[in-house]
Amino acid sequence: AIRKAITIATGLHCEAILLYAVRLGSGPKLEYGSQETWDRFSAALREVIPMAAQAKVRLNPENVWNKFLLSPLEMRAFVDQFHSPWLQTHFDVGNVMQYGYPEDWILTLGSRIQRVHFKDYKLSNRGVAGQFVDLLQGDVNWKGVMDALVKVRYNGFLSPEIDHDPAQPDQLKVVSASLDKILSMS
């Protein structure tokens, strides 16, 4: 699947592919252990890094809710094991809010960050799950995020990850205005 994605990305002149490992499990049932997932994902990536390098397409694992690479130290170690500029990371700001701090992830990952998703997350009271919300409506410390991105000299794409609602025709205007506010915080 990754080889096919590289081929498609090359045809589209796409410079990067977002990737993530299989989920460790579903609900309370463990399907793959952390070490097995690490080993299998690492092996799969080692096989395709030469193809990605030849195609000039970066492979960027993203921090997603799959119960794998749950800290910036784990993500950094995972990326660093390859010693390749063709494997970096796609960082999602909102995805870490349940178990970490985006600004800490940014400072820890530094130059390994190739792409960034902007998404907000509202933490809830104890025992109640949080939820993804519109930009600037959650608990992300956007000033801290922007300061961290500046500190690590990030100059790549910042793309909002939003749920499109056709019933709200002005939604993209609101997202654009929110992005302008966030970007002005640096």
Predicted regions and their residues:
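Active-site acidic/histidine proton-transfer and metal-coordination neighborhood
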Residues: 1-89, 98
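Histidine-acidic metal/acid-base catalytic patches
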Residues: 7, 13, 68-186
